[in-house]
Design a protein with these regions (language model features):
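OB-fold and OB-like single-stranded nucleic-acid-recognition modules
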Residues: 29-214
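Generic hydrophobic-segment detector
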Residues: 7, 11-13, 83, 162
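Bacterial N-terminal signal peptides
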Residues: 11-24
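N-terminal secretory signal peptides that target proteins for export/translocation
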Residues: 1-7
Length: 214
């Protein structure tokens, strides 16, 4: 794990998308075939490789106040989702758990090469793991496009932050995952996520500054 104070890796990530043979939204055609408009849009958003021009800081309260959208979108709800998913946002907190998802097919990869779920809570946790109030956590996801070798955001590096209960600031694109609305109140507080994550910073008490996790 390496920390730096600066520069995003837009050019590197864009080059990776080209090398993988991904489309403009970074989506493998196989992941879009024979699905609903909602599913196709969700897959396109998950596969984004562009970096937001800026990040709007949100508190946990502000994140939880994002519009409540049902599982099936009406025309007006489509407008809301499309507007919200163009926002780059940042959220500060503590990593409660890190989970390797077996959803690689979403990204045109083998199942075991899927997302890294990084679940944030507002307060420091007694320990890293799945205990405690899981219904109060915000889901953020590091997609395969932003995992090593593009970045150093490996499962081990993120788990280390969780075990140390380091304060982090995770930023990226807003995404509404309608497929997990029924999980609200179980292991998540909202269907809104930061997904994909495009920036991870760690607070340094010694330097009194945020340092980017490379």
């Amino acid at each position: 794990m390496t920390l730096e104070s600066g520069f995003t890796r837009t050019a590197t990530i864009t080059l990776l998308a080209v090398c993988l043979g991904l489309g403009a939204a970074g989506v493998p055609a196989s992941a879009l075939a024979k699905h609903s408009d909602q599913h196709r849009y969700l897959t396109e958003q998950k596969n984004r490789t562009d970096i937001p021009g800026r990040y709007e800081p949100l508190t946990f309260a502000e994140f939880l106040a994002l519009p409540a959208i049902p599982e099936k979108y009406t025309a007006s709800e489509w407008d809301t989702v499309r507007t919200q998913t163009q926002r780059g946002v940042g959220l500060e907190g503590y990593i409660a758990e890190v989970i390797q998802a077996a959803d690689g097919a979403t990204y045109g990869r083998p199942p075991d090469q899927g997302d890294l779920h990084v679940h944030l809570r507002a307060a420091r946790q007694p320990q890293c793991g799945v205990g405690g109030l899981r219904n109060q956590q915000i889901v953020t996801e590091v997609t395969p496009h932003f995992q090593p070798p593009t970045t150093g955001w490996s499962y081990e590096a993120l788990l280390d932050l969780c075990q140390r209960q380091a304060r982090v600031r995770i930023s990226g694109w807003l995404l509404h995952d309608y497929q997990h609305i029924r999980d609200i109140g179980a292991w998540r507080a909202s269907a809104w996520e930061i997904h994909p994550v495009t920036s991870i910073e760690v607070w340094s008490p010694e330097r009194e500054e945020w340092q980017r996790l490379r």
